[in-house]
């Protein structure tokens, strides 16, 4: 087992009950274009057109052959675009059960599938988009070969679901998905799970299971990659989430695209935090209807540390998100709040009484408790960064855009989620995720 000591389990109240309930009926689903790093769509549909589940909606011009398919059947209700015509979302009004069928195999044949057959079925069904590269967190090219594939079967994000609960009810599909991935490449398939977690595996020669323990970010793919198979400019690995592995297992046996998702609905603003069974790209406002405390709430697709606000054209469950988090907007001002002992406020430093209440869960809001200021290296980054890098120096390089130094310090190993804790504990109130993405884009473009 690999146990990390540095990190932070955010003591946030509103943790979901680890029991799966059926979610409400969903009448709108969408694909969010801005989730796919560097993607430039070539649209294959138009507004008002009827589509089947699994039908191609658009293709990536910059990554030919990579297609994005409909998560449900119905009609194209809207195609939202932002500045410079950036694709924000393709919305489908759900109707009927028409779907496209893909190649299917008897379970006994999965262990003998060729890499070409696996690749073709994943690409045509749109499940190829479940894979992401590291570095850069992009969908891999259809002819690319990874150095390894990392299956993330754990989650240490605040208010997250326990993956073992979800995997347990689909154990055979999960094992079949692993078997299919083992036929995609001869390289290692690293299945990463929490210490002692009951996660099934397959006996394929290239599948290895690893256990991780410790605080968040022990459950992030970036942490797994760093300790097992570090990447670099000339070494690429792929990552995939456990629910997508289940979907792959079902696809190859049934020939049907499975877009079911189990998400954790959590936060103190939720009346009954729990796990909900829904569909990929579900309209978040429908999922949360009647579920929230009547207040000024912020609904987030994903983690409170690194999720996206779910509203307007983005009011849909993200492709790579397994949770919906709800916290109150922090709009109120405190007079001389810094003088009070503040037992109800958490801080990683010893500036509040709440820091010393080790077993207490706190009500977090969107307030950042201060304005923008200079980056102050007081050791907070080092306390939450378990990777073998120099976080203060790296973060400073990200702020000034020094790509050469950032690359030397290990930025190619990272994704936005890997720096979310650094943003949370930053006294200067910097958001390091967008700064990292900007530097990565420059490195990819200029080398």
Curated annotation (Swiss-Prot):
Keywords: Ion transport, NAD, Sodium, Sodium transport, Translocase, Transport, Ubiquinone. InterPro entries: NqrA, NQRA_2nd, NqrA_C_domain, NQRA_N. Pfam families: NQRA_2nd (PF24836), NQRA_N (PF05896), NQRA_SLBB (PF11973). Its EC number is 7.2.1.1. One of its GO terms (biological process) is sodium ion transport. It catalyses: a ubiquinone + n Na(+)(in) + NADH + H(+) = a ubiquinol + n Na(+)(out) + NAD(+). GO terms for molecular function: oxidoreductase activity, acting on NAD(P)H, quinone or similar compound as acceptor. Belongs to the NqrA family. NQR complex catalyzes the reduction of ubiquinone-1 to ubiquinol by two successive reactions, coupled with the transport of Na(+) ions from the cytoplasm to the periplasm. NqrA to NqrE are probably involved in the second step, the conversion of ubisemiquinone to ubiquinol. Composed of six subunits; NqrA, NqrB, NqrC, NqrD, NqrE and NqrF. This is Na(+)-translocating NADH-quinone reductase subunit A.
């Amino acid at each position: 087992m690999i146990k990390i000591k540095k990190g932070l389990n955010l003591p946030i109240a509103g943790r979901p009950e680890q029991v799966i309930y059926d979610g409400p009926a969903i009448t709108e689903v969408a694909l969010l274009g801005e989730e796919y790093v560097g993607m430039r769509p070539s649209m294959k549909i138009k507004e008002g057109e009827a589509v089947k589940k699994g039908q191609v909606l658009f293709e990536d011009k910059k990554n030919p052959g990579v297609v994005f398919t409909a998560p449900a059947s119905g009609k194209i209700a809207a195609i939202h675009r932002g500045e410079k015509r950036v694709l924000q979302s393709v919305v489908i009004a759900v109707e009927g059960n028409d779907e496209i069928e893909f190649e299917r195999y008897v379970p006994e044949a999965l262990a003998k599938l060729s890499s070409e057959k696996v690749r073709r079925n994943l690409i045509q069904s749109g499940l190829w988009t479940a894979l992401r590269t590291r570095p850069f967190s992009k969908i891999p090219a259809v002819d690319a070969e990874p150095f390894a594939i990392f299956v993330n079967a754990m989650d240490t994000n605040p208010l997250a679901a326990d993956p073992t609960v979800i995997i347990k009810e689909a154990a055979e599909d999960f094992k079949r998905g692993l078997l299919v991935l083992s036929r995609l490449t001869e390289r290692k398939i690293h299945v990463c799970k929490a210490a002692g977690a009951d996660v099934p595996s397959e006996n394929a020669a290239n599948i290895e299971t690893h256990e991780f323990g410790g605080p968040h970010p022990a459950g992030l793919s970036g942490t797994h990659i760093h300790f097992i198979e570090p990447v670099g400019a000339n070494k690429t690995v792929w990552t995939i989430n456990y629910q997508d592995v289940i979907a792959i297992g079902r696809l190859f046996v049934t020939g049907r695209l499975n877009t079911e998702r189990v998400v954790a609905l959590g936060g103190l603003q939720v009346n009954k935090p729990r796990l909900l069974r829904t569909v990929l790209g579900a309209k978040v406002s429908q999922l949360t209807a009647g579920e929230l405390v009547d207040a000024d709430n912020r609904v987030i697709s994903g983690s409170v540390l690194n999720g996206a606000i779910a509203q307007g054209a983005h009011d849909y469950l993200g492709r790579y998100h397994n949770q919906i988090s709800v916290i109150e907007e922090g709009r109120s001002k405190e007079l001389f709040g810094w003088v009070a002992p503040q037992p109800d406020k958490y801080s990683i430093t010893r500036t509040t009484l709440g820091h010393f209440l080790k077993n207490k869960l706190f009500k977090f809001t969107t307030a950042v408790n201060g304005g923008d200021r200079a980056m102050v290296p007081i050791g907070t980054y080092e306390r939450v960064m378990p990777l073998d890098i120099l976080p203060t120096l790296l973060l400073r390089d990200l702020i000034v855009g020094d790509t050469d130094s950032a690359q030397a310090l290990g930025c190619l190993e990272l994704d936005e989620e890997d720096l979310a804790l650094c943003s949370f504990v930053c006294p200067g109130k910097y958001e390091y995720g967008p700064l990292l993405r900007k530097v990565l884009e420059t490195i990819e473009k200029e080398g």
